[in-house]
Curated annotation (Swiss-Prot):
Stated role: Actin-binding protein that regulates actin polymerization, filopodia dynamics and increases the branching of proximal dendrites of developing neurons.
Organism annotation: Gallus gallus
Name recorded for this polypeptide: Protein Abitram
PANTHER family in the record: PROTEIN ABITRAM
Keywords assigned: Actin-binding, Cell projection, Nucleus
Family: Belongs to the ABITRAM family.
GO BP terms in the entry: dendrite morphogenesis; regulation of actin filament polymerization; regulation of filopodium assembly
């Protein structure tokens, strides 16, 4: 499946946000939920990696010595072979030129359908087109959990409020 092609049809996606993942300020993620329940994990606009002056130096899907998201081999209608992810499962690690490293988490329970290998050779896609060709991964929630997958996530309007509060608290100090 070419997720980047599917992303072109934005009208089929509902945008949800998760702010301050694992208590890390501004490390926000976005999930684009398709009408067929597939979820595309992306960086949210306020994520530090998307701020001016940041340069991505490397992206690593090797999570531990025995776990690489690149080894995820999916086949068939039931997506056999897909790695199962919990909400806190790391998808990849991204390093920037200022020495910072960011762990990107799934925050969606389900099967890992695809990781975006294009960003390995062209990391700038993450910053230039974070909601389309610069996506991180595609996750398929369990059918029975597909309705509850967005519990605890923010709508675009709620996320804007979070960003406004951050802006007001930083300008007030």
């Amino acid at each position: 499946m070419a997720a980047a092609e599917a992303l072109g049809a934005a009208r089929y996606f509902t945008r949800w946000y998760k702010a301050d993942v694992k208590g890390r300020p501004c490390e926000d993620f976005c999930v684009l939920q398709h009408s067929n329940r597939i979820c595309v994990i992306t960086l949210a606009e306020a994520h530090p990696l998307l701020q001016p002056g940041k340069t991505i130096t490397s992206i690593n899907y090797q999570i531990s010595p025995n776990c690489s998201r690149l080894q995820n081999k999916v086949s068939g209608k039931s997506k056999r072979g897909a790695q199962f992810l919990t909400e806190l499962a790391p998808l990849c690690r991204i390093a920037s030129s200022d020495g910072e490293e960011y762990t990107i988490y799934s925050f969606i329970r389900g099967r890992l359908i695809e990781v975006n290998e294009n960003i390995l050779s062209n990391p700038a896609l993450l910053q230039e087109k974070p909601s389309t060709e610069g996506y991180i991964a595609v996750v398929l929630p369990k059918f029975e959990e597909s309705k509850s997958v967005t519990q605890g996530l923010l709508t675009p309007e709620e996320y804007k409020e979070v960003l406004l509060k951050r802006q007001n608290s930083s300008s007030g100090s």
